Amino acid sequence: MTNGKLFFDEAIETMARGDLDALVDERIHYTVNYAYEHSPFYKKWFREHSINAAEIRSHEALLELPIISGQTIREHQPPETMDFEFKSVEWPEVFTLHETSGTSGTPKTFFLTWEDWLRYASKYARIFTSQGFGTGDRVVVCASYGMNVGANTMTLAARELGI
């Protein structure tokens, strides 16, 4: 079980700390603005809390935001409302729909695009590569494949690596 590779995405995984922090901040800024522009919940939430989404530019700024609880999420999706207010893409872009287990009440629903799946798979590919897995190795995924995005994207990552 030696793939000879230390990294799946060497450019990202060996990035200098300052560059990595800058990339994280850039992606946070993008994500917050995307949520504001595309999610009915976040558009209203930012307005109600007098938060200018464009001013959130770093991971430190996230610490200043009010917490959104699981209960808040449940209150902004069916059956409490007529729509999924957290959904931030149009229906044709939704690749899969998932729910949490609902152990603390009504399950919370979330939506993934194909691009989201690829990001999840990339995360698992980095993990597998860092542990020495590569072409010809085998991995046993002991998680449920039903609506568990982890099991499915681990398998996608393994396939990409030839495992």
Regions inferred by a protein language model and the residue ranges of each:
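Conserved AMP-binding loop of ANL adenylate-forming enzymes
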Residues: T129-L161
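Nucleotide 5′-phosphate-binding alpha/beta core
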Residues: M1-E99, S104-S130, T135
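Short beta-strand->loop structural element characteristic of the AMP-binding/adenylate-forming
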Residues: T109, G162-I163
